[in-house]
Amino acid sequence: MTRHWPWEVSLRMENEHVCGGALIDPSWVVTAAHCIQGTKEYSVVLGTSKLQPMNFSRALWVPVRDIIMHPKYWGRAFIMGDVALVHLQTPVTFSEYVQPICLPEPNFNLKVGTQCWVTGWSQVKQRFSANSMLTPELQEAEVFIMDNKRCDRHYKKSFFPPVVPLVLGDMICATNYGENLCYGDSGGPLACEVEGRWILAGVLSWEKACVKAQNPGVYTRITKYTKWIKKQMSNGAFSGPCASACLLFLCWLLQPQMGS
């Protein structure tokens, strides 16, 4: 049985899934900046594990009011500041199926080897290709936090001369040596349970990680942007508690009833 991740968001462009995201507040979603393409019409779907809900009795469809890109975002060629805030047209109501994930404090630090989870609608495979198809049901993969220097060395072998830094301080790596999420899940959450709370450690940034199964996932490190995120929100405060481990367990038990 698949767990239920109540903060998971499908970011839609003209009603087509383009990226994942994480709900952090009734009115706000965090995703990757590189997911955003100009002034297209965006919306989000949440409260369901299905990519194409048959009805919206529990699933929510919400138009997007505004999207705020981080000013340091450089673009796909050399990704820095790969984080964006999605402001929803109307606040969502929390339920068993819709809950926010906690933002980490700026000084929060995850130890190497910490167990975390990544989620999204791409195929979980040992071998990836650019033609990987989206799956109708939300997928999950267990991953472990990886040392940034080791992660950087891994990618330098494949892409750049050794003197060029790739994995920067605003990034965080996680791996499970072959099982990872791939195309279609940029912006999706790297979620870690710490002392009974679920923390948004990162959002998926590098799709080049899909090229080889052994490549670690590279995520935008949310601690580097917590202050910026809170500043963009109207009062910097959250309207409800973020998801606890106890609540997630309850959601997991209720998951078979979702069906929408």
From Swiss-Prot:
One of its GO terms (cellular component) is extracellular space. The lineage of its organism: Eukaryota, Metazoa, Chordata, Craniata, Vertebrata. It comes from the Eukaryota. PANTHER family: TRYPTASE-RELATED. CDD domains: Tryp_SPc. The gene is PRSS45P. Glycans are attached at N55. GO terms for biological process: proteolysis. InterPro entries: Peptidase_S1_PA, Peptidase_S1_PA_chymotrypsin, Peptidase_S1A, Ser/Thr_Proteases_Immune/Dev, Trypsin_dom, TRYPSIN_HIS. It is an enzyme of class 3 (hydrolase). Pfam families: Trypsin. PROSITE patterns: TRYPSIN_DOM, TRYPSIN_HIS. Residues 1-234 form the Peptidase S1 domain. This is Putative serine protease 45. Keywords: Disulfide bond, Glycoprotein, Hydrolase, Protease, Serine protease.
